[in-house]
């Protein structure tokens, strides 16, 4: 993020009691030190109890008492029962935010989050990045299927947040070469990418002998799946 934007957020947070700062500190401690099995079990029990009281889908199954009783649901299962799964008081939780997958595995998926959940998601991500050396002002490239008019951001917001949109809707050689050129030309320092896209990019570099000596990349964050060993090299 731009420094001005970050400082503004920090001042606003401090004025409201430093909630986000405390959340980030808790996240860092949990990432570094871990959490106890008792804590995890207590949190899971609270979550299961909540959905059994507030979700029409889970209300129908009072016999489900332990995590093992709850069925594993695919994205397709959730989509089929989407309105039932949503908790009844979701509309009472203020502004809701939509988090969507690109559908690269065949099934697009969207979840709704309230403001508190979005704060936790963002602080967890920032905590993980900072623990791995991320610094304020670093220019990051976010790899995703950027769709104009749907999830793209303005040039001003891109500049303000030091965020470069790296489109991965096409992963052919021409597109991969363009990604390589953009990383070099725009002096991107942090890559935030899905493992599948990173695997394709590293495969292209290895296969073509593409020169990356002028890249300014210091950090790579991979999401989604485990990376093949060859990708690390």
Q: What residue ranges belong to the model's regions?
A:
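Nucleotide 5′-phosphate-binding alpha/beta core
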Residues: 1, 5-100, 106-138, 185-192, ...
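Conserved adenylate-forming
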Residues: 46, 146-233
């Amino acid at each position: 993020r731009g420094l001005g934007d970050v400082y503004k957020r920090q001042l606003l947070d401090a004025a409201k009691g430093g909630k986000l700062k405390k959340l980030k500190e808790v996240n860092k401690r949990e990432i570094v030190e871990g959490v106890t099995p008792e804590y995890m079990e207590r949190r899971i029990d609270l979550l299961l109890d909540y959905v059994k009281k507030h979700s029409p889908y889970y209300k129908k199954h009072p016999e489900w008492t332990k995590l093992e009783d709850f069925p594993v649901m695919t994205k397709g299962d959730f989509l089929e029962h989407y309105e039932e799964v949503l908790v009844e008081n979701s509309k009472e939780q203020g502004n809701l935010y939509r988090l969507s997958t690109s559908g690269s595995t065949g099934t697009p998926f969207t979840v709704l989050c309230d403001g508190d959940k979005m704060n936790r998601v963002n602080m967890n991500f920032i905590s993980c990045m900072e623990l791995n050396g991320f610094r304020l002002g670093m220019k990051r490239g976010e790899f995703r299927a950027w769709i104009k008019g749907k999830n793209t951001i303005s040039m001003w917001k891109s500049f303000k947040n030091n965020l470069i949109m790296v489109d991965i809707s096409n992963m052919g050689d021409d597109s991969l070469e363009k990604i390589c050129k953009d990383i070099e030309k725009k002096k991107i320092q942090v890559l935030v990418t899905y493992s599948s896209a990173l695997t394709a990019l590293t495969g292209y570099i290895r296969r073509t002998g593409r020169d990356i000596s002028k890249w300014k990349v210091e950090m790579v964050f991979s999401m989604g799946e485990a990376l093949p060993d060859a990708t690390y090299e």
